[in-house]
Every structure is written in C-alpha cells, then in structure tokens.
C-alpha cells in the first residue's frame, strides 16, 4: 500500500472518531436549550430562537473567513482553537439566567464553529476520493444520528439534576476533541496551493453557479433546523414531558442506521444528485405542513418519521453535490462558503420560526408556523429545479456547439 493510500485510510478513521466526539458534545447541549429556557424558565420561544439563530448565523455565515484562513495556515490550529472556544461557550451557557448571557454563550459557540467546521469539511474532501464521498457522507450521517441520540439521552438524564451539568459535559467533550486533534492531526494543507485569504474568497465569489446554489439552500435549512427548536417544543407540548424529546432523536437514529446507507448506495446508481436532493426536500416540506394540526404523540412521531426520511434522502446528496462543485485550489474557502445557506436559513428558521410559533400560539392558530415552513420548502424545491434545468440546458448547448 502506498503512503498516500495509507494516509487516506488512517484519515478516514481519524475523521470518524473526531466526528463522533463533536456530535456527542453538540447534542448533549443544543437539543435541550429550548426545553430549558422555554419550558423550564418560561422564556418566549423567540428569545431562544434569537440565541440559536445567532449561533447558526455566526458559525455558518463567517465560515468563508474560517475556511480562507485555514487555506492559508492549515487545518490544525484552526480546529483546536475553535473547539476550545466552543467549550468556553458551553461553560458560559451553564450560568445563563438572562437572555444576553445566553446570546453571548451562543456567540462564543458560533465563533468556535466558524474556526473548526470549514477545515474539518475540507479534510473530508481532501482525504476521501470523489467516487467514495457519497458513501462516506452517509456513514457520517449515520454516526451523527447515533451520536445525536446518545447525546440527547445523556443530556436529558443530566437535565433532571442540573442544566449546569449538561453544559459542563458538552464543554469537557469539546476539550477532549481539541486535545485529540492537537495530538494526532498532522499539519496537513487543505488546498493544492497555499492560497492567500483574499484570493480564496474571491475565487468563490466569482463562481456564480456555486453562489446561487448555496444561497438557494437557505430555504432547505429553514426546515432542517427545526429539529433543534420547534419540533422539540412540539413534542414536549403534546407529550407533556421533556423526556419524550429523546424518542424523537431515537427515531432519527433508527431510521438512519437502517435506511441511510442502503438508500444512498441504491439511489447513487439510479438517480442524479440533484434529483435526490429535490425528492428529499419535497418529502420534508410535505411532512411539515400538518404538524400543527395533530394532537396525539403517535401522529406527531409519524410525521417526524416522514421528515427524517426526506432528510436521509436529501442530506448525503447535498453534501456530495457541494463537495463536487468545490475548486481544489481553495477547498477551505469553498466549504466555508457552502455553509452560508445554513447561516441565512438557520438564522431565519430559528428567529422566524420562534416568532411564528409564539404568534400562532397567541392567535390560537398552532398550524401557522408549520404551514409557512412547508410553503417555503415548496418554493425552494421549485427554485432548485429551475437552477438544475438551466445547468443541463447550458451543458447540452455546449455539447451541440462542440
């Protein structure tokens, strides 16, 4: 086996262990934020939505800067610094009794993610061969689902005693992850050339096809982020107990572990990436619309199952499509910018979703936020379809002219 192949194989195992630590640290804390501050402390959902949206927007919106800096200086220093910063954010969250302190803790957490997330994504693109990326992203998603359940179960158990224990556990896991990267991650370059920060960012901004695709995905993310805000609140309201939230993540884990990899393997042989992304988005959108009209936990979990199936179909295709469009000369910048759709969609989804949830509750129209999210998903589906049809038309025109 050549040294390059050996490095790739070892890199896969490193990425999987690193991903598990990050997922556990994140899901111990974040799914319980809405339960802690809305249900237990009586805050308005929009206040918590602002905090979650702030974290999302900072982490993903500034990702292009984190990626461009990593292109220049390498992945290791950015990843270690970012993970320690997230640990500090979680420690601060444990003592948050005023909205401003929760917002500050989410700001710290988001800045940490800005530093470590783009270089981690770029390492996947660097180490995994193009023909293997779809399957590897599926493995990461399966791991995400299992880690989400374990993290949510651990966090729910700790929440019975003290929310500070929840946050301390998340902080410790990120400190461990920082130590793991500091000890074992080689000083790898992310790009084929050492790209100056400004040049990497400029290269991305001039790629109009990539920019349009990323911004359109904001609508997709408005739906996806509700697993952190409105769906846990809805499950808690219907069940009457925060402990039911862990079953929501258990459903995701069961579906992901049994269906994600087989669906990815089968669909990559029969369907284009864009068709898989659009099909998953359509299922997610349609499953959102009736959520506000259900009154039983079984009905709600059925819709959540449908939502997760849509995500299982869409997410590996979205990740693979984003990676395939990235320029190898500025991988960090591209993967950082690819998070901008999540920044915009996540911020609007959290803040707008929280506001619509409060509005629907006060107006005795609980279906309002869910119908709006479904409509947004349908419009995003149509916009993606138009983009992909334009790309195919341009390709056919070039082939004919040739």
UniProtKB/Swiss-Prot annotation:
Q: On the Periplasmic side, which residues?
A: 34-98, 160-164, 235-243, 298-299, 361-367
Please give the family membership noted in the entry: Belongs to the major facilitator superfamily. DHA1 family. MdtH (TC 2.A.1.2.21) subfamily.
Q: Does the keyword Transmembrane apply?
A: yes
**Looking at the Swiss-Prot or TrEMBL record, what is one Pfam family this protein matches?**
MFS_1
Q: What does it do?
A: Confers resistance to norfloxacin and enoxacin.
Upper lineage is: Bacteria, Pseudomonadati, Pseudomonadota, Gammaproteobacteria, Enterobacterales
UniProt superkingdom? Bacteria
Q: Which coarse location class applies to the principal site listed for this UniProt protein?
A: membrane
Topological region Cytoplasmic: 1-12, 117-138, 186-213, 265-276, 321-339, 389-402
- Give the GO terms filed under biological process for this record: response to antibiotic
Q: What is the name listed in the Swiss-Prot or TrEMBL entry for this protein?
A: Multidrug resistance protein MdtH
The topology of this chain with respect to the membrane is: Multi-pass membrane protein
Q: Which SUPFAM superfamilies match?
A: MFS general substrate transporter
GO: which molecular function terms?
Answer: transmembrane transporter activity
InterPro entries for the chain:
MFS (IPR011701), MFS_dom (IPR020846), MFS_trans_sf (IPR036259), MFS_Transporters (IPR050171), Multidrug-R_MdtH (IPR022855)
Provide the transmembrane region boundaries.
Answer: 13-33, 99-116, 139-159, 165-185, 214-234, 244-264, 277-297, 300-320, 340-360, 368-388
Q: Does the keyword Membrane apply?
A: yes
**Mind listing the UniProt keywords for this protein, alphabetically?**
Antibiotic resistance, Cell inner membrane, Cell membrane, Membrane, Transmembrane, Transmembrane helix, Transport
Subcellular localization: Cell inner membrane
What GO CC terms are in its UniProt record?
Answer: plasma membrane
């Amino acid at each position: 086996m050549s040294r390059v192949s050996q490095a790739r194989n070892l890199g896969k195992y490193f990425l999987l262990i690193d991903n598990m630590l990050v997922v556990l640290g994140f899901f111990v804390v974040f799914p319980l934020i809405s339960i802690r501050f809305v249900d237990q402390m009586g805050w308005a959902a929009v206040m918590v939505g602002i905090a979650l949206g702030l974290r999302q927007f900072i982490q993903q919106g500034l990702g292009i800067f984190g990626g461009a800096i990593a292109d220049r200086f390498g992945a290791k220093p950015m990843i270690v610094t970012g993970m320690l910063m997230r640990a500090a954010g979680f420690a601060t969250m444990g003592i948050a009794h005023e909205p401003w302190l929760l917002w500050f803790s989410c700001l710290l957490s988001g800045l940490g993610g800005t530093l470590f997330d783009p270089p981690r994504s770029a390492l996947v693109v660097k180490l995994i061969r193009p023909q293997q990326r779809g399957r590897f992203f599926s493995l990461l998603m399966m791991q995400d689902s299992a880690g989400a359940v374990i993290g949510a179960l651990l966090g729910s158990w700790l929440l019975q005693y003290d929310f500070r224990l929840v946050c301390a556990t998340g902080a410790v896991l990120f400190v461990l992850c920082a130590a793991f990267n500091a000890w074992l991650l080689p000083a790898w370059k992310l790009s084929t050339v050492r790209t100056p920060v400004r040049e990497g960012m400029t290269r991305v901004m001039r790629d109009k096809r990539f920019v349009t695709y990323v911004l359109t995905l904001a609508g997709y993310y408005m739906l996806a982020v509700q697993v952190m805000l409105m769906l846990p609140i809805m499950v808690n309201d219907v069940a009457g107990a925060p402990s039911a939230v862990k079953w929501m993540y258990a459903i995701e884990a069961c579906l992901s572990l049994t269906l994600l990899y087989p669906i990815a393997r089968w669909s990559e042989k029969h369907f284009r990436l864009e068709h898989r992304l659009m099909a998953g988005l359509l299922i997610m959108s349609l499953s959102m619309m009736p959520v506000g009209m259900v009154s039983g936990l079984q009905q709600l979990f059925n819709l959540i199952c449908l939502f997760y199936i849509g995500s299982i179909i869409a997410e590996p295709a979205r990740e693979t499509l984003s990676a395939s469009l990235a320029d190898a000369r500025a991988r960090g910048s591209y993967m950082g910018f690819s998070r901008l759709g999540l920044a915009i969609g996540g911020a609007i989804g959290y803040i707008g979703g929280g506001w619509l949830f409060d509005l629907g509750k006060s107006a005795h129209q609980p279906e309002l936020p869910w119908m709006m999210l479904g409509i947004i998903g349908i419009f995003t589906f149509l916009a993606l379809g138009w983009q992909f049809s334009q790309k195919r038309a341009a390709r056919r025109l070039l082939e004919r002219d040739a």
